[in-house]
């Protein structure tokens, strides 16, 4: 059971009562809908109203648009949703991750090259001030991966580099800046850590090959730093971490090894248990091959929930998932 009075929520007694009362009044369909972020394919008002009223989504990550377009879209969504929506953006490099006319500040690698965490703080502050102005309340950032392998096709310039201490310092500074915007939250990614493999989880299985000790001193230290300072959400990647999976379940065979999004060993054992994370766990995009190659969709969704995932990116097809 989640302790909503503890970090990172710190809800009051009346806040907790609102949550409990709201859940108690929900239908089963409404509860199912809360599991999903929809990837909004249209800003048509009828489509937006249908999405929240018929499918009861918990969050949305939308297609690019201008500030005026995104503001109006988010206004329609919130006005028609029974439960306030999580509206997410990808402000890794600037406010242009929330709207096309937002400010591009610079990649995380460019920020890290300065050696000055103040720039990462300002990236988090300014990017998400623009995001909040158009109605967003969650950033899928900071990217908290460590670029150990230059052949990695996913993270590249999206990281704060290959030094875990610098990554931790910069990622924390970004989060601190984002938190200066009232009510704004961060989702660090991609747990348990990308940057070692040459494979791309969009099209194949990807593996974090570190030993438990190596992981603790690198990715573990980065995530522990963010968790200790109030990180609200973590995006689980479609990445395997065999050492820690077998630490929590020594009987696991190679065939049974699953990516974090399907692994109770990594979500419940490592992230919840060892690191003490009490916030939200969401999947990376659920149509990536790193997830879909493991089992059919009708099995993936309940397996991820059983592993400890709270929300999915995205619907594959609304009717199918519902």
Language model region names:
Residues 1-106:
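N-terminal hydrophobic targeting/anchoring segments and the immediately downstream early-domain regions
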Residues 27, 70-79, 85, 95-97, ...:
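Second-shell residues forming the walls of enzyme active-site clefts
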Residues 34-44, 108-122, 204-218, 287-295:
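Active-site mouth loops of central-metabolism enzymes
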Residues 37, 52-62, 137-145, 308-312:
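Divalent metal-dependent hydrolysis catalytic cores, especially in the metallo-beta-lactamase
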Residues 41-54, 120-130, 214-225, 295-301:
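Short, acidic/polar
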Residues 66-70, 113-129, 164-169, 213-216:
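Glycine-rich anion/phosphate-binding loops
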Residues 90, 127-139, 183:
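Acidic-leg catalytic submotif of subtilisin-like serine proteases
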Residues 144-154:
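Short, conserved phosphate-binding/catalytic loop or strand-edge motifs used
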């Amino acid at each position: 059971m989640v302790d909503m009075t503890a970090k990172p929520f710190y809800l009051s007694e009346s806040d907790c009562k609102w949550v409990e009362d709201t859940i108690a009044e929900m239908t089963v369909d409404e509860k199912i809908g809360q599991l999903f972020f929809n990837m909004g394919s249209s800003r048509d008002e009828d489509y937006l109203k249908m999405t929240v009223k018929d499918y009861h989504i918990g969050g949305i990550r939308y297609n690019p648009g201008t500030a005026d377009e995104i503001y109006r879209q988010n206004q329609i969504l919130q006005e028609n949703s029974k439960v306030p929506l999580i509206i997410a953006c990808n402000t890794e490099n600037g406010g242009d991750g929330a709207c096309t006319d937002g400010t591009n500040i610079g990649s995380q690698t460019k920020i890290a090259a300065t050696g000055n965490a103040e720039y990462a703080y300002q990236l988090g502050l300014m990017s998400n001030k623009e995001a909040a102005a158009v109605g967003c309340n969650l950033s899928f950032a900071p990217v908290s991966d460590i670029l150990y392998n230059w052949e990695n096709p996913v993270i590249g310039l999206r990281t704060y580099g290959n030094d875990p201490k610098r990554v931790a310092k910069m990622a924390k500074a970004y989060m601190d800046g984002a938190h200066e915007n009232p009510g704004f939250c961060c989702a660090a990614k991609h747990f348990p850590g990308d940057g070692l493999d040459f494979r791309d989880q969009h099209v194949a299985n990807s593996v974090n090959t570190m030993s438990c000790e190596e992981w603790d001193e690198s990715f573990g230290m980065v995530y522990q730093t963010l968790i200790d300072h109030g990180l609200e959400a973590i995006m689980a990647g479609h990445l395997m971490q065999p050492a820690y999976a077998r630490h929590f379940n020594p009987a696991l065979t190679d065939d049974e090894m699953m990516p974090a999004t399907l692994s109770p060993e990594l979500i419940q054992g490592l992230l919840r248990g060892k690191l003490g994370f009490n916030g939200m766990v969401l999947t990376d995009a659920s149509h990536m091959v790193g997830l879909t190659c493991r089992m059919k969709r009708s099995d993936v969704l309940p397996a991820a929930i059983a592993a400890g995932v709270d929300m999915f990116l995205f619907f594959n097809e609304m009717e199918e998932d519902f």
